[in-house]
């Protein structure tokens, strides 16, 4: 089962453009409150974490991912590192800060891929199971991605304090 999701978000930041860029580039601060990102670690330009994903019929699984952090003039991007194995995730994103009438706006493009190997199925029952697992996984990841802007927005609003 492989599910690929791409989403775009616009998230308010209470600070000016420079403060929002600093926030965005600090992965611990900007992504630390996203509920499905666990065990977030940053070493140099390498970001590692676990993606908490509800896998059909297996429950919640922690799929590790690794991305490379790259700065650009108006923000930062995460470049996904290819993975292998029976279960994996990749996370990529590009955040750009723009001025707003009050504070700043972060435009974020998020791309997540999740892969979980299921036992090979050659009979019609197994094929039906695969289709059901694929549909269930797609719905679960859709729900999961709704948490992303909420988590980043909560972290951004905490900057007011």
Where are these regions (language model features)?
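Short, surface-exposed coil-to-beta transition loops
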Residues: 4-6, 61-66, 87-94
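Short structured motifs
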Residues: 5-6, 35-36, 50-51, 77-81, ...
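Solvent-exposed residues in well-ordered beta-strands and their adjoining turns
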Residues: 10-16, 52-56, 70-72, 98, ...
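A short, structured loop/turn motif at beta-sheet edges
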Residues: 14-17, 41-45, 70-75, 96-107
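Glycine-rich portal/gate segments that line the openings of hydrophobic small-molecule binding cavities
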Residues: 38-86, 143, 147
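Beta-strand/loop substructures that line and gate deep hydrophobic ligand-binding cavities in soluble
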Residues: 83-138
């Amino acid at each position: 089962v492989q599910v690929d999701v791409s989403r775009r978000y616009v998230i308010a930041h209470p600070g000016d453009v420079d403060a929002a860029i600093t926030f965005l580039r600090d992965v611990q601060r900007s992504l630390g409150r996203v509920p499905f990102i666990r065990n977030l670690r940053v070493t140099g330009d390498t970001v590692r974490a676990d993606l908490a994903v509800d896998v059909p019929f297996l429950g919640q699984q922690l799929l590790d991912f690794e991305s490379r952090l790259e700065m650009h003039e108006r923000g930062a991007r995460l470049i996904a590192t290819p993975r292998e194995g029976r279960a994996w995730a990749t996370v990529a994103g590009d955040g750009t800060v723009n001025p707003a009438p009050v504070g700043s706006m972060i435009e974020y493009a998020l791309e997540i891929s999740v892969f979980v190997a299921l036992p090979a199925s050659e009979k019609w029952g197994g094929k039906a199971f695969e289709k059901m697992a694929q549909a269930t996984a797609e719905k679960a990841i859709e729900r999961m991605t709704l948490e992303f802007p909420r988590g980043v927005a909560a972290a951004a609003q905490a900057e007011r304090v």
